[in-house]
Every structure is written in C-alpha cells, then in structure tokens.
C-alpha cells in the first residue's frame, strides 16, 4: 500500500493538468509555461503567455536569465509527443523546479482554454471534470 501511495504522490509532484495550470495562471502564481516544441509549432499555436524554448535548445546559456524561484511547466503537442518530457528533464537537470503538462496543448484545448498564434482558438472554458 505504501508503495502505491508514494507512486501517486510522486506522479502529482511531476505533472500538472490543464485545469490546474489555468488556475495557477489565473491566480498569478509564479508559474512560467514553456512550449518545448520547435518554433514553427509555437508560431502556429501556443498556450497564452507561454515562452518558446525547444527542448533541443535548453542549456545553461538559453536559461541564464530565468527565475530560479518559479515553477516551470513544460508542454508539447500531447500524448504522441515527448518534447515536454525531454524539456522537463533538461530543465530539471539545469536545476529548475519543473512539471509536465498532462496531454499538452491538445488537452489544454479539449478543456476549453484559448490559444494564441496563427491558428489560435478562442476557447470555450468547458473546464475540468475531475
């Protein structure tokens, strides 16, 4: 039983769902959203306020001005993409506090939140059913 409890506690320590991210941003918590995809994907569509830092470019130079006290949330396209996992790993290796957005931008949109970019969506704010 204790192993299962630890597993789920650990999982919640490293992941965040779109509803929790939206709430944290709405409360102006010290959260920085990182789109870990390549620039062309970011320009097409991204979470409002997100910065684009492809996981392949994450290093001590590209993150030198980042706030070390912030919580960083990395995302990518969704479950068929591992850029957010790679980005979260890279940022963690660089000493940042990081979580991965469950489902990426696809689940962000499924929950009804708006996006920015050339193919932005207005958002419907359906909300989390959990």
Model-derived segments and their meaning:
Residues 22, 62-63:
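Short hydrophobic/charged patches on amphipathic alpha-helices used for structural packing
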Residues 42-48, 108:
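Short loop/helix-cap segments at secondary-structure boundaries that form the rim of catalytic
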Residues 64-109:
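Catalytic cysteine-centered active loop of the rhodanese-like fold, especially the PTP/DSP P-loop
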Residues 56-62:
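Alpha-helical scaffolding within the catalytic cores
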Residues 51, 68-69, 115-119:
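Short, hinge-like loop/turn segments at secondary-structure boundaries
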Residues 1-33, 39-44, 117-130:
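Flexible, polar/low-complexity N-terminal or interdomain linker segments that lie immediately upstream
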Residues 21, 35, 50, 91:
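Terminal peptide-recognition signature
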Residues 28-33, 48-49, 71, 96-97:
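Short active-site oxyanion
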């Amino acid at each position: 039983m204790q192993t299962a409890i630890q597993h789920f506690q650990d999982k919640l320590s490293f992941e965040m769902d779109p509803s929790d991210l939206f709430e944290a941003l709405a409360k102006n918590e010290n959260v920085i959203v990182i789109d870990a995809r390549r620039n062309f994907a970011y320009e097409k569509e991204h979470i409002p306020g997100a910065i684009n830092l492809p996981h392949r470019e994450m290093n001590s130079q590209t993150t030198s001005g980042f706030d070390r006290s912030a919580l960083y949330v990395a995302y990518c396209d969704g479950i068929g993409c591992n850029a957010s996992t790679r980005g979260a790993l890279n940022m963690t290796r660089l000493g940042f506090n990081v979580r991965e957005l469950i489902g990426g931008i696809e689940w962000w949109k499924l929950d009804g939140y708006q996006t920015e970019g050339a193919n932005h969506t207005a958002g419907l704010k359906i909300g989390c059913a959990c």
